[in-house]
């Protein structure tokens, strides 16, 4: 990546999308790091649709382990757990724990 951005550069980059709604008053208590994690989850949700990961109620779900989030965001285990919790408290995601070392299902 260069220091300066040119008009021709826009098509050469892949971007994560973060909904503008996350920057409104309702979500002011959600940290910027949690919003970034949410952007990663949204990006993966498109892959879940492509893979047909849809439950009986028609809801798209995904698997995104704490370890995977750590690798993407370069945060420790405790920090990632806190970020997932923030998203749950803000009603942005629902995690269904499966137990026995299996990753949670994320809606």
Regions found by a protein language model. Name each.
Residues 27, 44-107:
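Winged helix-turn-helix DNA-binding recognition segment
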Residues 1-66:
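Short recognition helix of helix-turn-helix/winged-helix DNA-binding domains
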